[in-house]
């Protein structure tokens, strides 16, 4: 871990990394929460609670989060916001019984995400203030997160369905792969395996698992 106080902590990507990145720290917290569920180790629960508190306490007044704490990381995008919300949602469902305003944080965060990162037709924006570039990773993360979050906020199912429809119509090649980006100048059709194809496969699986209304 990189930052630690009596009440908070933040995990780093690696032992050598010095950046404080919110979604990365929460991924570590998810792993510890699962280990706590399996072992009942109370020390793990304390670590999870402190790391969750760190992120909740840094939620901005509008409901969003910067990517990280350094000045060069003080921007927001669609998929990192989705990652943060999803981790908080999963940690809530672990039933850790921690004294934190998790539901209030989720409500505020989901409101911000829905209001700032999607157009009415399902286009996934990259930044709150800019649609372009429309990125396949933004689309995939949004679909998966929205469908999973729909158990907490029913709007998630509609968001996930709308983004999926838009993505298939606008970013799926007739050969079956998904394009990398749509910029203001046009489509970048490179089929990146991890960034695009793997994440869209995950998104499609999440959609099929959660969908109740049909595409």
Please name every model-derived segment.
Residues 1-215:
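Glycan-recognition and catalytic cores of secretory/periplasmic carbohydrate-active enzymes
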């Amino acid at each position: 871990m990189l930052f630690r106080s009596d009440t908070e902590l933040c995990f780093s990507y690696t032992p050598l990394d010095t950046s404080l990145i919110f979604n990365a720290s929460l991924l570590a917290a998810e792993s510890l929460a699962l280990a706590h569920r399996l072992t009942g180790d109370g020390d793990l629960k304390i670590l999870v609670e402190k790391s969750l508190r760190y992120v909740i306490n840094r939620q901005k007044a509008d409901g969003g989060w910067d990517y990280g704490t350094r000045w060069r990381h003080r921007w927001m995008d669609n998929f990192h916001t989705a990652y943060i919300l999803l981790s908080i949602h999963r940690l809530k469902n672990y039933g850790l019984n921690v004294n934190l305003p998790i539901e209030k944080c989720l409500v505020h965060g989901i409101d911000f995400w829905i209001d700032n990162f999607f157009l009415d037709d399902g286009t996934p924006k990259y930044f709150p203030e800019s649609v372009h570039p429309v990125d396949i990773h933004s689309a995939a993360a949004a679909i998966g997160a929205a469908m999973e979050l729909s158990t907490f906020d029913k709007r998630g199912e509609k968001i996930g369905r709308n983004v999926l429809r838009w993505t298939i119509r606008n970013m799926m090649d007739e050969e079956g792969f998904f394009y990398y980006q749509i910029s203001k100048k046009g489509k970048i059709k490179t089929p990146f395996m991890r960034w695009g194809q793997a994440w869209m496969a995950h998104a499609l699986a999440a959609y099929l698992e959660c969908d109740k209304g049909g595409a």
